[in-house]
UniProtKB/Swiss-Prot annotation:
Required for cytoplasm to vacuole transport (Cvt) and autophagy as a part of the autophagy-specific VPS34 PI3-kinase complex I. This complex is essential to recruit the ATG8-phosphatidylinositol conjugate and the ATG12-ATG5 conjugate to the pre-autophagosomal structure. ATG14 mediates the specific binding of the VPS34 PI3-kinase complex I to the preautophagosomal structure (PAS). The keyword Coiled coil applies. This is Autophagy-related protein 14. It comes from Saccharomyces cerevisiae (strain YJM789). Keywords: Autophagy, Coiled coil, Membrane, Protein transport, Transport, Vacuole.
Length: 344
């Protein structure tokens, strides 16, 4: 091949046919190829050795490695050193940032401590007073709870003794007199006209005594008191109107005690409906046993005059009450002081 400018031969070019058919040309090129392969193998071995030594240079003798002075190994070592420096710089920068944050937080903590100390010095008096007051209130509440439990147990014990003393009991198979107190029948609107006046007065007196003791144990003040002086058994001469008035006052006191014991609601009640369901003896017995009673609510409270008229109407109505009581035989004619109604 000739140069187009100077026309000198630069390279010798042979065609493929001549190369394949000429033994001298083929042998020479094959020998050159073999030599190149051997040189490549030798260079590959050196490169691998240099790479291995460069990767494990920290485990080899540095002076011995420096004596070799291989360019590739030196370049790789420099590259590792640069990488290490870069990592060290990043770590150093991160450490500096963390130190700055730590210093800023320390300064903030010290400022907060100063403020807390100032606040404590300012609020130490009021804080101590509040703490002492809370402790005293807690102790007082605990003592009050203990005293309340003791008072309730003592009250229950006294009420049980009072019930045993007055022998309050529920009679079986007796529709006319279902309840008894101190071996006397409990008065109701249904048996008021059946019992003699002396028995009625004695029963009301006993119920008044029980109500008085009951209110003393509960330490409550009743709307009415029994101001009528007690007379001997055979010298009682109260009229029916006076007995009815005492009975109404007794009903009001019973309802007041039931409200205090939360047996009935404190709101206005439908007293006629309540008496129709329980009657006076049922109210008294449920109060003694502290049983809750069903009630109907109304908008106005009942007065003494309204109750007086209602009680008189109920006692004068012969069609009122339980069928067994309405069909009961008429009372036996007795004297004013006959005690045949005493129950046992």
């Amino acid at each position: 091949m000739h140069c187009p400018i100077c026309h000198h031969r630069a390279h010798v070019v042979y065609c493929a046919h001549c190369i394949n058919t000429s033994p001298s040309l083929l042998l020479k090129l094959k020998l050159d190829l073999i030599l190149l392969k051997d040189e490549n193998k030798e260079l590959n071995g050196k490169v691998e050795q240099i790479l291995n030594e460069a990767m494990n240079y920290d485990q080899l003798d540095i002076k011995r490695m420096e004596k070799k002075k291989d360019p590739l190994m030196n370049s790789l070592m420099k590259l590792d050193v640069l990488r290490m420096k870069k990592n060290n710089n990043l770590i150093r920068h991160r450490i500096e940032q963390l130190n700055e944050r730590i210093y800023s937080k320390r300064n903030h903590i010290s400022e907060l401590k100063v403020e807390i100390d100032n606040y404590k010095c300012y609020k130490v008096g009021t804080g101590t007073d509040k703490l002492i007051e809370q402790v005293e209130i807690s102790d007082a509440k605990n003592k009050l709870a203990q005293v309340s439990k003791i008072c309730e147990s003592v009250r229950d014990y006294k009420l049980n003794l009072l019930n045993n003393w007055f022998v309050i009991q529920k009679l079986q198979d007796n529709f006319q007199i279902p309840f008894a107190i101190a071996f006397q029948p409990l008065i109701s609107l249904k048996n008021f006209r059946v019992l003699p006046l002396a028995i009625t007065n004695d029963s009301i007196n006993i119920m008044w005594k029980y109500i008085s003791f009951f209110s003393d144990i509960l330490m409550i003040k009743l709307p009415y008191t029994n101001k009528i002086c007690e007379q001997p058994m055979f010298e009682f001469s109260d009229s029916i109107q006076t007995v009815v008035q005492r009975l109404i006052k007794l009903i009001i006191n019973i309802l007041q005690i039931c409200r205090h014991l939360k047996l009935v609601p404190s709101t206005p009640m439908d007293i006629p409906w309540l008496l129709d369901q329980y009657d006076v003896d049922g109210l008294f017995y449920n109060m003694v046993k502290r049983n809750k009673m069903k009630c109907r609510s109304v908008s106005l409270y009942w007065t003494f005059g309204m109750l007086y008229s209602m009680v008189l109407d109920n006692m004068n109505n012969p069609q009122r009450g339980h069928p067994a009581r309405r069909t009961a035989p008429p009372p036996t004619v007795t004297g004013p002081h006959d005690r045949w109604y005493v129950v046992g």
